[in-house]
Swiss-Prot record:
Protein name: Proteasome subunit beta 2
HAMAP family for the chain: Proteasome_B_A
Cellular compartments annotated: Cytoplasm
Subunit structure: The 20S proteasome core is composed of 14 alpha and 14 beta subunits that assemble into four stacked heptameric rings, resulting in a barrel-shaped structure. The two inner rings, each composed of seven catalytic beta subunits, are sandwiched by two outer rings, each composed of seven alpha subunits. The catalytic chamber with the active sites is on the inside of the barrel. Has a gated structure, the ends of the cylinder being occluded by the N-termini of the alpha-subunits. Is capped at one or both ends by the proteasome regulatory ATPase, PAN.
Length: 211
């Protein structure tokens, strides 16, 4: 059973070491994340990928334990492909998020140390935030990780549901860079994914070229 002390330790592990951002607008969804991986106060890796894809139109951002995140990423891909090869057919983004929430809820007493954003475009833009207990919320904009308080301040101040996908991508980039400047566990650069009805485009930005 998870006691309060352990729960706080788990939450600290999830919050420690990254900043990810998701933004939903009329044209699609933007997912963004920094590239630093930390082990305590040590920079373990400067070029980690935290924006991943289930399909060309569905992506995720990851925060938490690397091993748990790798497993959960495989689970998400299996959920999608299983539906495709059975009579059920293509699964919606909401369906994928709900299935993952069920998995996380079922293991909450021995939890996977993860926080996941799932975003993409099926018949419309969708963006979901899931924590390690299986809590799931649909969001217009959201930030996770140790730098999320800084990033969320930028999003709160500048988000507009009528902004274009390019404007949302620029906002996501600036939100993560703001966290890089103030959060020691967030760093190197930013990957920004623009997901729309025709697929996705990915951009990379760095404070300087030397990494």
């Amino acid at each position: 059973m998870v006691i309060m002390g352990n729960k706080l330790q788990l939450e600290n592990k999830i919050l420690k070491g990254t900043t990810t951002v998701g933004i939903k607008v009329n044209d699609g969804v933007v997912l963004a994340a920094d590239r630093r991986a930390s082990a305590g106060f040590f920079v373990a890796n400067k070029m980690v990928r935290k924006v991943l894809y289930i399909t060309d139109k569905i992506g995720i951002t990851t925060a938490g334990s690397v091993a748990d995140l790798q497993f959960i990423y495989d689970v998400l891909k299996n959920i999608y492909h299983y539906n495709n090869i059975t009579k059920y057919g293509p699964i919606s983004i909401k369906g994928i998020a709900t299935r993952l929430a069920n998995v996380l809820s079922a293991t909450k007493y021995f939890p996977y140390i993860v926080q996941i954003l799932i975003g993409g475009y099926d018949d419309q833009p969708r963006l979901f935030n899931l924590d390690y207990l299986g809590d799931i919320t649909e969001e217009n904009y959201v930030a996770t990780g140790s730098g999320s308080p800084v990033a969320m301040g930028v999003l709160e101040d500048e988000y507009n549901p009528k902004m274009t996908l390019d404007e949302a991508a620029d906002l996501a980039k600036r939100a993560v860079f703001s966290a890089i400047k103030r959060d020691s566990f967030t760093g190197t650069g930013v990957i920004v994914a623009k997901i729309h009805s025709k697929g996705h485009e990915e951009l990379e930005f760095y404070l300087n070229k030397k990494v």
